[in-house]
């Protein structure tokens, strides 16, 4: 795990998706737990469970599968703001992904939330990544 935990989460999920694995294990931190809750609520993953091994906590994510197929859905995840170049947006300029089908994950003063929640509360923040 590197210094950019959000990029690591995206990479873990993307690699598991490309390898056609049903589950992926990621290290558990406050940021990863908040992001995983949003992904679960938005329907991009099926299930989450906590796992403890050698005094380290992990989250085991079950990726969403298509009916009657063993392959997972192809989720496109794209990191936007990164440690070397932070990208911020106010509530009016939060981008819409694929006409509202995709989700923008933001870090705001009120925690990590989706673009829809941020628009409703009329707050902006750092654009972490897109998923669609």
UniProtKB/Swiss-Prot annotation:
PROSITE patterns the record matches: RIBOSOMAL_S8
GO cellular component terms, semicolon-separated: chloroplast; ribonucleoprotein complex; ribosome
InterPro entries the record matches: Ribosomal_uS8, Ribosomal_uS8_CS, Ribosomal_uS8_sf
Record SUPFAM superfamilies: Ribosomal protein S8
Gene Ontology biological process terms, A to Z: translation
Subcellular compartments: Plastid, Chloroplast
GO MF: rRNA binding; structural constituent of ribosome
Keyword Ribonucleoprotein in record: yes
Pfam families hit by this protein: Ribosomal_S8
HAMAP family with a match to the protein in the record: Ribosomal_uS8_B (MF_01302_B)
Name of the protein this chain belongs to: Small ribosomal subunit protein uS8c
The organism of origin for this protein: Nymphaea alba
